[in-house]
UniProtKB/Swiss-Prot annotation:
Protein name as it appears in the record: Isoprenyl transferase
UniProt keyword terms in alphabetical order: Magnesium, Metal-binding, Transferase
Top EC class for this record: transferase
Enzyme Commission numbers on file: 2.5.1.-
Chain segments annotated as transmembrane: none
Gene this protein is translated from: uppS
GO molecular function, one term: magnesium ion binding
Protein's organism: Rickettsia felis (strain ATCC VR-1525 / URRWXCal2) (Rickettsia azadi)
GO biological process, one term: polyprenol biosynthetic process
């Protein structure tokens, strides 16, 4: 009964965003390589996605690779890009079978043509699924997204820009505002992630590294969220 109650609470959350932080530090802690840490982080998606589905969360966004991550070593960057490709290769059929709609946001033009094709194929295959939307933020930065949106609006010939114009010009105009943003890893910042969409999001930080995060940690974050009063600037 208690577990059912916890799940019922979750129906209030329409969009859960997660900064998947701490892969490398988790690897150091376990005497593993950074690559092994990132792989463990990717495996965690496979583990937790069924829980998100059971919790009836309509929209999940995962921050997997930021625009600033391009400045890391070429070895690490190449592995992270390869990991995304492997994820789609290994998981796409299962995701599709389970009703998951795939979206990918970011400056995808910086990726190889083969990976862009793989991403587009995943989006096309799953576009009519409606159980849950899994949005992967890759080569993504929120400031860059807002700049790209404004550039797009200006190119359309508009002289004045409204909030609505920007919202419709973002990478995913259908993305709902973030209700709860979770960041594991013991770091207390949002690192250029969904700044527009998370304007009124509740923030939850955990000292646990992402590869160590589990279902109970998600439930704990949800229960914490359920106790908060969201005023959206009102009284």
């Amino acid at each position: 009964m208690q577990q059912h109650l916890k799940y019922k609470i979750m129906t209030n959350i329409k969009h859960l965003a997660i900064i998947m932080d701490g892969n490398a530090r988790w690897a150091d802690q376990h005497n593993l390589t950074k690559s092994e840490g990132h792989k463990a982080g990717a495996d965690k998606i496979r583990e937790l996605l069924p829980e998100f589905i059971n919790l009836n969360i309509p929209y999940i966004t995962l921050y997997t690779f930021s625009s600033e991550n391009w400045q890391r070593s070429s070895t690490e960057v190449d592995f992270l890009i390869k990991l995304l490709s492997i994820y789609f290769k290994n998981e796409l059929n299962s995701l599709h079978k389970n009703g998951v709609k795939i979206k990918v946001i970011g400056r995808l033009n910086l990726l190889s043509s083969s990976l862009q094709k793989q991403i587009n194929n995943a989006i096309e295959l799953t576009k009519n699924n409606n159980k849950i939307t899994l949005c992967i933020a890759f080569s993504y930065g929120s400031r860059q997204e807002i700049v790209d949106a404004c550039t797009k609006i200006i190119a359309s010939g508009k002289k004045e820009i409204s909030e609505s114009d920007i919202g419709h010009a973002l990478y995913d105009p259908e993305m709902p505002d973030v209700d709860l943003l979770i960041r594991p890893g013991g770091v207390y910042r949002i690192s250029n992630f969904l700044l527009w969409q998370a304007a009124y999001a509740e923030l939850y930080f955990s000292p646990k590294y992402w590869p160590a995060f589990n279902k109970d940690d998600i439930i704990e974050a949800i229960n914490d969220y359920s106790k908060r009063k969201r005023t959206f600037g009102k009284r």
